[in-house]
Amino acid sequence: MDVRTRTEEIERLTLTPWATFSDESRGRQRPEEQDPIRPVFQRDRDRVLHCKAFRRLKQKTQVFLSPEGDLYRTRLTHTLEVSQIARTIARALRLNEDLTEAISLAHDLGHTPFGHAGERALDKLTSGGFKHYMQSLRVVDKLEKDGQGLNLTWEVRNGIVTHTKGIWAATPEGRIVRMADQIAYVNHDIEDAVRAGVLDPATLPKDCTAVLGQTKSARITTMINSILAHSDGDVGVGAEENEAFLALRDFMYATVYVDKTAKAEEQKVDKVIGELYEYYLAHVDQMSNFYVQLAYQDNPERAVTDYISGMSDEFAIRTFEDVFVPRKWHVL
């Protein structure tokens, strides 16, 4: 018996009956030989962790555009916090941690530079619109490994594309990630907003903090405990905690996410993304080689969207400067 088979047997003995079992996966788009050590979802987790798009998350905005300081969240730190919360819940409910972690780590791979401001900019430019969760799926299916994709399992791909809104994931692990994503971003965005000076913690709705707690740690713990207490046969959450959490999220949308400073910077994002988009549509051959090939194989608009959405904040700004800002001449 190889290590993978033994691990799958341990899953049968330890996971809850409504968990997603590795040996019952619906499979991959392209059949592969099984790994002798790792079950399929662990293998997916590893592929995501080692891919280029995952590394780029470290220089992609979470909420505040190009923040200075070492303590602000990036898209990468957000992803890691989502993974931690989701795995905590999965372990407590005896669900599949490997699947939970794979979805968590992959859920934002398609995010644009400059956070949701960049997403909105590309959404306006791209025919058919742009949604980061659909782009995340395109990244793992098509763009990684020079067009081969990561060939992830159906369950991970389903969790990626359903992590934010609309229809819920088909697996309980995917549904956990969706909840963990919201728990993570609302709470760490509060912390970052306070640090940035755009939010006074005393203004947080008292009816929300009375239920959820005064601190980030307390609020996260409250939500986790509520999920654990109301999940039996499926993932759920208590009505009181959920109502308070949604009200707190609405408060953040009404205050921090529409802060005048953030909105002023968003206009600059529109310009950077818009100018780069039009430039590369007219100069397809100046993109990286892979995207040039993609433009001729697929279509230029799709390739330009892929190229820009994959940029980090820093790379997008540097590229904009290289293309549109005159270079200095040193005259002796």
Regions found by a protein language model. Name each.
Residues 101-106, 179-180:
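Short alpha-helix carrying the canonical HExxH Zn2+-binding catalytic motif
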Residues 110-114, 184:
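Short active-site segment of divalent metal-dependent hydrolases/proteases
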Residues 1-79, 83-89, 96-97, 118, ...:
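Histidine-centered, transition-metal-coordinating active-site segments
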Residues 115-127:
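A glycine- and small-aliphatic-rich helix-loop capping segment at beta-alpha/alpha-beta transitions
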